[in-house]
Amino acid sequence: MSDEAKEKRELESQKESSHNKSEKSVEPKPKRRRRRNYDDYDAEVAKEETKAKNGLTKSENNGTVEDSESDMDDAKLDALMGNEGEEEEDDLAEIDTSNIITSGRRTRGKVIDYKKTAEELDKKEPSTDSKDDVGYGEKEEDEEDEEDEEDEEDDDFKEQ
């Protein structure tokens, strides 16, 4: 046991000495920061600017040639724009009107025959109404059936 304790103490002293060494090594070596030298870059930019200015004066002299080219480009662009308008009209002509749902209910793309679904619901849940309440309860049942159908549609949509 005493040997183990001595080894532990030796390790602790080594850790402390290494810790002190690392602190000492950091302090005497300050990091030197270098500044970037942009003088060369500034000279290049100045040269490019002078070339650009010289190019502008030359282009002013040759402006008539560039104007005719730009007119040709404008004519081409106008022709292209005219073609795009025709393409949009063609897209509208390609729409199949048989797929458009004209009913007022949103069905998320499903075509629902409400009469058939009402019959199916009646088969699943036979009505327990008495003959006395037939006239009074029909409207409420229709509303409930519609809500049930919508809930089932929502459930089907969530499952997909």
UniProtKB/Swiss-Prot annotation:
At which residues is Phosphoserine found? Answer: S68, S70
- Matches recorded under Pfam families: CHZ (PF09649)
A GO cellular component annotated for this chain's UniProt record is: nucleus
The answer, when asked if Phosphoprotein is one of the entry's keywords, is: yes
Q: Where is the composition biased (Polar residues)?
A: 56-65
Record carries keyword Disulfide bond: no
Location of the region described as Disordered in the Swiss-Prot/TrEMBL record: 1-160
Q: Where is this region: Important for H2A.Z-H2B binding?
A: 87-108
| Known partners and oligomeric status | Forms a heterotrimer with H2A.Z-H2B, stabilizing the association of the histone dimer. Also, with a lower affinity, forms a heterotrimer with H2A-H2B.
Family according to the record: Belongs to the CHZ1 family.
What does this chain do?
Forms a chaperone-bound H2A.Z-H2B complex that acts as a source for SWR1 complex-dependent H2A to H2A.Z histone replacement in chromatin.
UniProt protein name: Histone H2A.Z-specific chaperone CHZ1
Its taxonomic placement starts with: Eukaryota, Fungi, Dikarya, Ascomycota, Saccharomycotina
Q: What is the gene name?
A: CHZ1
